[in-house]
A protein has these predicted regions:
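Alpha/beta-hydrolase fold catalytic core
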Residues: 1-82, 107-108, 148, 326-328
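Conserved alpha/beta-hydrolase catalytic His-Asp/Glu region
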Residues: 45-47, 54, 187-193, 203-263
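Active-site loop/oxyanion-hole signature of alpha/beta-hydrolase fold enzymes
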Residues: 68-69, 74-78, 112-153
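Conserved HGGG/HGGXW glycine-rich cap/lid loop of the alpha/beta-hydrolase fold
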Residues: 76-120
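Flexible "cap/lid" loop of the alpha/beta hydrolase fold
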Residues: 163, 167, 174-205
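Short beta-strand/loop motif that positions the catalytic acidic residue
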Residues: 264, 270-272, 276
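Conserved alpha/beta-hydrolase "acid-adjacent" motif
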Residues: 277-283
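Catalytic active-site module of serine/aspartate enzymes centered on a nucleophile-bearing elbow/loop
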Residues: 294-328
Length: 328
């Protein structure tokens, strides 16, 4: 018969049970730390994706996919109320809208796609991804989802795509929101000066290159963990040829939005970050002056952000979009 320790006989049962449970929890915490640490070092892309999925769940969004024409579209969808479709900008993806989506989904039905060629949507080798081709794909996507009349919002080059679609399909668009839009007459920006000097910041092969782009896009660049930056660097290297080819195609259409302004008949919102170094804020004047047929024109500027208001100022951005959507 094994001797019984004094502790076993004198310690109350509930304390012994608690001690065992705490030991079990300590082992679980240690194991979780090992798994997360290993994932950060060896599979940071999984941690990044898991973080985005958590954000999407918090915003009551689900991930879907649908084959339409030459593209397998990946998109978020969720929320209840009037429909808003949100389009990301150049070399971006649907995840940039998540901070704003968390504030909109309680009042609106959101559809947030990865535009063809970007994110998790498919890409056709040597395919055309300029404004006209993307607007045509967007039309097919909207029809496939059988969306009712909706508000359409686009950022950067996504704004030019949104405007091209709205100009061709005005009966489908209840309102058009253009955020830091590409394709308008504007003063020279830091981006245009770099490109003219032969330096395209959207092409980078190391952390320093990413930091240069982040400094252009953000007033206060986010403090990303190094291994997460490495994921973005590797992705950029992998997509380098596509990014370069698509950038050149868009660079050849500097007034892709300007030339369509007179055909926009729905209410239009122009929203700009005051410190945008990608597209100078003077473009907002071109937008205002060119909207000769719009039924209503609203403009807003946000201080303290660069080119990405939905990431740097999500609360203000969501408030402005909500006000615009509810007033039209």
């Amino acid at each position: 018969m094994s001797p019984t320790s004094p502790t076993d006989t004198t310690t109350p049962l509930w304390k012994r049970m608690l001690r065992r449970r705490l030991k079990f929890l300590a082992w679980r915490v240690a194991l979780l730390a090992i798994v997360l640490g290993g994932s950060y070092l060896f599979a940071p892309q999984w941690l990044m994706r898991a973080g985005h999925l958590r954000e999407a769940m918090a915003a009551k969004l689900e991930t879907h996919s649908v084959q339409v024409g030459d593209t397998r579209w990946s998109y978020y969808e969720g929320g209840e109320g009037p429909t808003i479709v949100l389009l990301h900008g150049f070399a971006g993806d649907k995840d940039v809208w998540l901070p704003v989506a968390a504030l909109l989904s309680a009042h609106f039905h959101l559809v947030i796609p990865d535009l063809p060629g970007w994110g998790e949507s498919s890409r056709v080798a040597q395919g055309n991804y300029d404004v006209d081709a993307q607007a045509a794909r967007l039309d097919a996507f909207v029809q496939a989802l059988r969306l009712p009349r909706f508000m359409l919002a686009g950022h950067g080059t996504g704004a030019a795509i949104a405007a091209a679609y709205a100009a061709d399909q005005p009966q489908r668009v209840a309102g058009l929101a253009l955020l830091d839009a590409y394709g308008l007459k504007a003063g020279e920006s830091d981006l245009t000066r770099l490109v003219r000097a032969g330096n395209n910041p959207y092409l980078f092969g190391d952390r320093a290159g990413y930091a240069q782009l982040a400094a252009l896009e953000f007033a206060q660049p986010p403090d990303r963990p190094g291994r997460f930056v490495d994921v973005l660097v590797e992705r950029n290297r992998r997509d380098r040829d596509f990014i370069q080819r698509t950038f050149q195609a868009w660079h050849a259409q500097p007034l892709a939005l300007q030339q369509r302004l007179g055909r926009l008949t729905m209410p239009v919102l122009g929203l700009w970050c005051h410190d945008d170094r990608i597209t100078d804020i003077s473009a907002l004047d071109s937008l205002r002056n060119g909207l000769t047929a719009a039924s209503a024109i609203s403009t807003s500027t946000i201080n303290g952000c660069g080119h990405l208001p939905m990431l740097e100022k999500p609360e203000t951005t969501a408030q402005i979009l909500t006000g615009f959507a509810l007033s039209h």
